C-alpha cells in the first residue's frame, strides 16, 4: 500500500508544480509571442551595448572604486559581526533562549529586505553618499552570514564544545576553540561568495542616492547612451571575472586547510604555507583598512529627531486599510504578483540553467567549450538585475512580464554557477562506467549523474526562489511589476504608515517562504 502511494507522489508533485506555474504565468501576463515579435528591439539594444565607448572608460573608474569600497567594507564588517553573534542563534550551543529568539527575529526581519531598500532607508538616516550604501551592505551581509553561520554551527560536531563546557569554560570561548575551526572553511567560502554578490548589489545602490556606479548607469540608460552603458557593463564584467578567479584561488586555499591551521596555530603547517597564509590575511586586512579609511562620513544635516520620530511612528503603525485591501493596488494583490513573478522567473531560469551547467564544466565537454560558456555565464552574472529590467522593459513594456524575464535571466547566471559546482563535486565513476559500456551520454547522465545532484539542485532552486522573492520586491522601481514601486514611492513621500504596511507584508511573505523551504 505504501509503495503504491509513494509511486504516485512524484507525478502528483510535478502536476501540481505545472498547474502552479501555469496559473502564475497567466497571472503575470507572460506572452512569449509578444517577446518574439519585439525581439528586434532587444537585438538593436544589444548591438549598441556591445560597441562600448572606450573613451568613457577613465570617467567610471572612480565610481567603480566607490562600488568596490562599499562591497569590501560592508562584506568584511557584516561578516565579522555575524561571526560574533551567530553562536547565540544556534540551538545546539545552548546559549540563552531569549537571546536566540531575539537574534533569529532580527535576522528574519533584516533578511526580508533587499539591499536596495536597506540603502534607501539608510539615506534617510545618514544622508546621500557611500556611507548609506556601506551601511546597507553591512546589514544585508550580517543577516545572511549570521543565518548561514548558526546553521553550520548546529550541524557541527559539538562533542569538543560540550567537553570544554563541562570543564568550566564559558560558552563563547568554547565556541571559538571547539566549533569555529570546524565551520571556518564554510564561513570564509560563504563570505567570498557574498562579496561577489555584494559587488552587483553595490552597483545599483546609486539609484536611491547611496553612491557607487549605479547613478551613472541609470543616467546613461535614461539618456539612451547605450555605448557608454556598454562601457560600464564591460568594466563590471571585468571586475566580476577578477573576483571570480580570485575566489576560486582563495576557496582552494581555504579547502586545503591552510587558513584553519594558521588560525589554530598548528605546527604541522609548512613554513611556505604559513608565510602564504599570512600574506593573504595581511592583504585582506590592508584592503579593508584602506577602504574603511577612504569611507565618506555620514551627513546628518538633514536628519532630525522629529523626522526619525515620525518615521518610527509610521513604521510601527501600518496602514491597515491598505494592508487588507483586495483591490488591484492593494497589498495582497501586489504581494501575489510578486510571488508569481518569482515562481515563473525561477522556474524558467532553473530549466535553462540545468543544460548550461553541463556545458560549463570540463567533466562533460572539452575545455575550450567549457571556458567559452563560463565566460557567457560570468557575463550574465555581472549585470545587475535592475539593468536587465531597464533593458527588457523596452521590449515587453512595463508590467509583471518584464519582471519575469528579468528574474529568469538573473537566475540563469546564479543557478548555472551553483549547478556547475554540484556537478564538479559528484563521483564520476558511475557515469564513466556507463560510457565504457557503450551507453549514450544522455541516458548515462540520467541514470548516474542526476540521482546524485537532484537534492543539491532542489536546494539551489529553493535558495534562488527565496532570493528572487526579495529581488522581485524592488523590480517595480523600473516598472517591472511587484511591490517595489509602491514601497519606494511611499518612502520617498514620507508615507511611513503605508511603507510600514508593505514592509510588514514582505516580512510575512519571506517568513512563509522560509517555512515552506525548511519542510522540503
Question: What is each model feature region?
Answer:
Residues 107-141, 377-408:
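Generic hydrophobic transmembrane alpha-helix motif, especially the helices
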Residues 23-33, 119-126, 196, 290-299, ...:
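A structural signal for multi-pass alpha-helical bundles of membrane permease subunits
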Residues 1-72, 76, 243-347, 359, ...:
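N-terminal, non-cleaved signal-anchor transmembrane helix
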Residues 73-107, 344-377:
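Transmembrane-helix boundary motif in ABC transporter permease subunits
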Residues 213-250, 483-519:
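Hydrophobic alpha-helical transmembrane segments of polytopic membrane proteins
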Residues 128-194, 201, 245, 398-449, ...:
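Membrane-cytosol interface at the C-terminal ends of specific transmembrane alpha-helices
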Residues 61-69, 103-110, 196, 332-340, ...:
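Alpha-helical membrane-interface segments at transmembrane helix boundaries
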Residues 35, 47, 92, 96, ...:
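Transmembrane alpha-helices and adjacent helix-loop boundaries
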